[in-house]
Every structure is written in C-alpha cells, then in structure tokens.
C-alpha cells in the first residue's frame, strides 16, 4: 500500500507535468519532457492536458500530444480527437496524428468518424491515415471475431503501430517488393515496412532506406520513423539528405531529424545543430528536442521527469 507521502508526491508530480506541458513560456524541449512523462500516466489529468496540448500553437507539440493519446489507447479521448481531425484550421500533421490515434484506440465506433474524413479531408496525408486506421480497426475486429492472436498487437519496439506486420514467412525480398510497389495499398505497404523493421539486418534496412523515395509523404515519414527505431547508421546519408531537402514535407523532415537524434553520431549532431534554426518550426523544434534528449542521455539523466520528492517549480 502506498504511503500518504508517496500519493501526495505523485499528485504533485502530475499537476506539475500538466502545467509544464501547456506552459507556452517554457522551452519546447521542457514541454516535451512533460509530454513524454505524462503519456506514462493514466486518468483525467494527463488526458485533459494532452487534449489541450493537441491544439497548441506548436504543431510539433500538438501532433505529439495526439500521438500520445493514441499510444495510451484512451477511449475517453475519442471526442477530442474527432474534434481535432475535423478542424480544418489545424495543420495536416496534427489532423493526421488524430486520425492515427483513433485507429490506435481501435474501437468500431471510430469507423464513421474516419470514413467522413477519408472522403472529405483536403490533405492527402490525412486521407491516407484514415485509410490505414480503418483497415487497422477492421483487422482488429476480424481477430476478435475469430478469437485468434492479433497482428496489431504492440510491436517489439513497444509502439502501437498503424498496421500489423506482414506474415512472418514472407522473405525480405518479397517484403521489399511490396514496400516499393506504388500500386499496392497503403496498409499492405505499411505491413511490409513493419515486418522488415521487425526482421532487422542490413538487407531489410536497405529496403527500408530505398522506400524513402516513395511518392507518399505519409509513407516516407513512417519510413524515417522506423529508421529512427532501428538506429542504423546505414541510413545516415539518406536521412541527412531528407533533412536538408527544404522541398520535402515537414512531417518527413521532422521524422528524419528525430531518427538522426537516435543515431547520434558526430555528423548527426552537427546536422541537428544546423537545422535547429530552420525556418520551418516543425523541423527546427524537432532538432531542438532531439539535441536536448541527447544532452540528457550523455549526462546519464532521464529526459522524462522522475521525482522522488516534490518537484521544484520556480
């Protein structure tokens, strides 16, 4: 049984994190520290703070808050995520993440919400996300009906992926063909991507790197995200090229920046420092957060807030 002091500290920590997340006077890296800490907590406090943050003026923070709500699979967040998805004043990267979160939560009641945006949202990346989310929910429903093990369970990387990995008996060559095939459906290509990620190895990484030339910005951004999970230096040159390309979609450059932060060699760090001044805020803030995370890691400290006593608030 927890002591009263322990409960009090936890309550104070939660309050501190919620306030820090929505405090626009704080550096973006500090707000991300709060966000990454809150996604490990449950209940109305963290949920409501993340919902509020999903409409923040920082599109990077807003989209990460929506992503966190999806990873938490909190059904109570569905009305707020629907509102974000339907708000055309919000950046497509935020609406996309709301759609993905609805797919991650995975309830059948989200189908009509997603179908509406699939047919009406002006942004291709949002429509493609709705397509993925609908297929994920369909797959989950089929698994429940057949009482079989799910292909949409949490990945070895502890993430709720927008698609389950393709069948494990597929070869790397077969998966590569599917991933690079522009005539295949988005869900099938995502499934190949996650199967290649789970397979690992240089041949699989090479196939993933090659798919950064895909015509879909949504797929390219997921590819960069996966390369960050794999932390493979094989991808360094291609990720650097993506970050440097000012004509690339900000959501793709942002994921490339985060992936470079995961690789964290001298060249990656130099690039992050250079592009932390990029005119596109999504890119600049991604670099700033990645550099801050590396600074904490190199000093042996956790980027997330963990307190054994009440946090000091100045």
Swiss-Prot record:
Its EC number is 1.14.99.29. The modification N-acetylmethionine is found at residue 1. Transmembrane segments: none annotated. GO terms for molecular function: deoxyhypusine monooxygenase activity; metal ion binding. Its cofactor is Fe(2+). GO terms for biological process: peptidyl-lysine modification to peptidyl-hypusine. It comes from the Eukaryota. Keywords: Acetylation, Hypusine biosynthesis, Iron, Metal-binding, Monooxygenase, Oxidoreductase, Repeat. Fe cation 2 binds at residues 221-222, 254-255. HEAT-like PBS-type repeats lie at residues 61-87, 94-120, 188-214, 219-245, 252-278. It catalyses: [eIF5A protein]-deoxyhypusine + AH2 + O2 = [eIF5A protein]-hypusine + A + H2O. Pathway: Protein modification; eIF5A hypusination. Binds 2 Fe(2+) ions per subunit. InterPro entries: ARM-like (IPR011989), ARM-type_fold (IPR016024), Deoxyhypusine_hydroxylase (IPR027517), PBS_lyase_HEAT (IPR004155). It holds the Pfam family HEAT_PBS. SMART domains: EZ_HEAT. It is an enzyme of class 1 (oxidoreductase). The keyword Glycoprotein does not apply. Catalyzes the hydroxylation of the N(6)-(4-aminobutyl)-L-lysine intermediate to form hypusine, an essential post-translational modification only found in mature eIF-5A factor. Belongs to the deoxyhypusine hydroxylase family. PANTHER family: DEOXYHYPUSINE HYDROXYLASE, PBS LYASE HEAT-LIKE PROTEIN. This is Deoxyhypusine hydroxylase. It comes from Arabidopsis thaliana (Mouse-ear cress).
